[in-house]
Swiss-Prot record:
Organism: Myxococcus xanthus (strain DK1622)
Summary of subunit composition and partner proteins: Interacts with MglA.
Compositionally biased intervals (Acidic residues): 527-536
Positions on the Cytoplasmic side per record topology: 434-646
Job description of the protein: Essential for growth. Interacts with MglA to control social gliding motility.
Protein kinase domain residues: 25-300
Region (Disordered): 373-410, 521-547
CDD domains: STKc_PknB_like
Active site residues according to the UniProt entry: D163 (proton acceptor)
An MF annotation (GO) of this entry: non-membrane spanning protein tyrosine kinase activity
Lineage, uppermost ranks: Bacteria, Pseudomonadati, Myxococcota, Myxococcia, Myxococcales
UniProt cross-references to InterPro entries, sorted A to Z: Kinase-like_dom_sf, MasK-like_C, Prot_kinase_dom, Tyr_kinase_AS
UniProt-recorded name of the protein: Tyrosine-protein kinase MasK
Any matching Pfam family: Pkinase
Length: 646
């Protein structure tokens, strides 16, 4: 039986090596760049001609002055370095050179599981069942080691990966399986911890409790392993739908087809193992990843032990071909590279970061030009350390201006930095949708913001929770002028797990919007965001004329763009009522209830609710107009962070 055909051709193209010294290493080739770091194939040099292939993950220079980014980057290295297991990628060093932190990790000659599955789809066949099971068994054993890991005092660290998917399972030509990317892992040892309510990971593979922003444990990783197994067996993502809200609706309702309905030749026993791993309630899943691995191992030995299965390494070599295997496994020595590319490499060193027309994943899988599918998800992701703030588009968002120290005579209010914060939380008929985004006003510097607590709000309860709007303040005199929001959206965000979907937004005197695609597809991103990976297509931007058209399913992109249009007025609330702000930096949440006509009721949460800034935010939020939609109500909780600089 042939699976549905997928489209990710495996392409290769030569890149001129950099051959650029960096600390004790020589950077051979840039592989990818995202919102937090850039990835290089490198050589570690030693005495008497010693050299070893490694991978360098280097923090982007403009982030080195951001303590939160730096600490999370270091946290990732410290945690992953402790997890010494054959099925976990090994971290060799956390270092600092030329003003930037970097992580050195082992180089692996192989392919990620996602690319392996997609190539099988292109060839219109399934990956052999014994190979699929071996991948999931070994990955589960590596995760179990991480889940059980303790500190020096024997106290459990309660590690949860939170981002398991086929793209984070790496298969080597030597037959190893490695779990990648502990960049957003939850652990007690982390110095930068996230809160309950912060949603991290990829929607398509999340456990329901993770999607709700609830506390997660190892069973969330087991659920993600089950989803990965489902995809590997059927070439269908069980919760793939037309947009993010529909994905989360299916996930939270447990709506999926049994695997044997898609592939009848699957044994019933294997389907039972898979569905137990994907049980809706955590208590109904396997209690540990080891128990899941044991169940698969038992099935493999009882049903497939005599099938003459090809070893994993041999399968990969045949699947991708001898040329690909040779390129991955036989990287030329530095002497050979220098002799071959000496002049050209010197020219390549002058290129600006990110100027290369192609990108590769962490271990050298070359991406097609302009293809976000393969370029934007390296094996170990480059993730912003501000909780849940993705980098779905251009790679260099989120820089802040340095904050000078207060003067001795008291604080002088000169510049107010306001970040339209990182999370959107939509609830329609009790379904939580979540998209993280930022806007960068031309005259206001961005401040990394915390992410809202995710709560499902049923439509019938929304009015009661929001209540009547508070007393409105007269409109602030900062209405957007024509063309004033271009940078706000072009440099803004896209969607979580989601799409690299930026747009340039122009506003006429009446506030009617028109869009022009910004062409950011193909930029290296730290979150696997393509529609193929997440199954969520970006909703089109609609003008006010859309109110006369048919109603739509209100998507997160729609919400983001409408709020971006009112960004200037919202920012002015903080500037006008800065005396109401209790500290030099903080956050306030505003809840919007968007009725089916597109009109808004707003209410400020917390201690600023009755203040001038709170009332101003409500008034400006209620001026927003969204596309008419099919739901009775959609509730959006928007956190706004501010920072006052001298």
């Amino acid at each position: 039986m042939s699976p549905p055909q997928t489209t990710l051709p495996v392409t290769e193209a030569g890149l001129v090596p950099l051959l650029q010294p960096y600390g004790p290493y020589v950077l051979v080739r840039k592989l990818a760049e995202g919102g937090m770091a850039e990835i290089f194939l490198a050589k570690l040099l030693g005495a008497d001609g010693f050299e070893r292939n490694v991978v360098i993950k280097r923090m982007l220079p403009h982030l080195t002055n951001n303590p939160d980014f730096v600490e999370m980057f270091r946290d990732e290295a410290r945690l992953a370095a402790k997890l010494a297991h054959p099925n976990i990628v090994q971290i060799q060093e956390l270092g600092f050179a030329e003003g930037c932190y970097y992580i050195c990790m082992e180089y692996l000659a192989g392919e990620d599981f996602s690319t392996t599955l997609r190539l099988a789809g292109r060839k219109r066949h399934y990956v052999p069942l014994p190979v699929v099971l071996r991948v999931l068994i070994d990955a589960a054993r590596g995760l179990h080691f991480a889940h059980e890991f303790t500190n020096e005092a024997g106290q459990p660290l309660n590690v949860v990966h939170r981002d398991i998917s086929p793209s984070n399972l790496y298969l080597t030509y030597q037959g190893q399986v490695k779990v990648l990317d502990f960049g957003i892992a939850k652990a007690e040892s982390r110095l930068v911890n996230t809160r309950t309510g912060v949603v991290k990971g990829k929607y398509m593979y999340m456990a329901p409790e993770q999607a709700r922003g609830k506390e997660v444990d190892r069973r969330a990783d087991i659920f993600a392993l089950g989803v990965s197994l489902y995809e590997a067996l059927t070439h269908v993502r069980p919760f793939s739908r037309e947009n993010d809200l529909a994905v989360l609706n299916a996930l939270l309702q447990g709506e999926l087809k049994p695997p044997r309905e898609l592939r009848p030749d699957l044994p019933e026993e294997l389907e039972a193992i898979l569905l137990k791993a994907m049980a809706f309630k955590p208590e109904d899943r396997y209690p540990t990843a080891e128990a899941f691995a044991d169940a698969l191992e038992t099935f493999l030995s009882e049903h497939l032990s005599g099938s003459g299965a090809m070893p994993l390494g041999a399968f990969l070599k045949g699947h991708f071909g001898e040329e690909r295997f040779t390129e991955r496994s036989r990287i030329p020595t530095l002497a050979t590279l220098t002799a071959t590319y000496g002049g050209a490499a010197a020219g390549a060193q002058g290129q600006a970061p990110g100027a290369e027309p192609h990108g590769t994943n962490l271990y050298g899988v070359l991406a097609r030009e302009g293809d976000a599918t393969s370029a934007q998800r390296p094996g170990m992701s480059m993730r912003p350390s501000s909780p849940g703030v993705p980098a779905h588009g251009a790679a260099s968002r989120g820089s802040t201006s340095p904050e000078s120290a207060p003067t001795a005579g008291g604080r002088r209010w000169r510049t107010l930095a306001v970040g339209l914060a990182g999370g959107l939380m939509l609830a329609a008929a009790g379904i939580v949708g979540y998209r993280q985004w930022m806007t960068t006003p031309a005259s206001v510097s961005l401040v990394p913001a915390t992410v809202p607590v995710v709560e499902a709000v049923a439509p019938e309860a929304a009015a009661a929770q929001v209540g009547a709007p508070m007393e409105a303040v007269a409109p602030v005199g900062a209405a957007a002028q024509a063309g004033s929001l271009t940078d706000a959206v072009a440099n803004g965000a896209g969607g979580d797990v989601g799409e690299t979907d930026s747009a340039q937004l122009s506003v006429d005197a009446a506030g009617v919007t028109e869009t022009d695609e910004a062409g950011l597809a193909g930029a290296a991103s730290d979150v696997e965001a393509e529609a193929d990976e997440e199954g969520a297509d970006a909703a089109p931007v609609r003008s006010k004329k859309a109110s006369s058209q048919k109603r739509v399913t209100l998507g997160i992109d729609d919400v983001q763009r409408v709020v971006s249009r009112g960004r200037a007025r919202i920012t002015t609330c903080f500037e006008r009522y800065k005396a109401d702000l209790p500290s030099s930096q903080g956050e306030v949440q505003v809840q919007l209830t968007i009725v089916s006509s597109g009109k808004v009721r707003a209410g400020t949460r917390g201690p600023l609710a009755s203040s001038g800034v709170g009332r101003c935010l409500e008034a400006q939020a209620e001026r927003l107009r969204f596309p008419p939609h099919r739901d009775q109500e959609v509730t959006v909780v928007m956190p706004f962070s501010w920072r006052v600089t001298q």
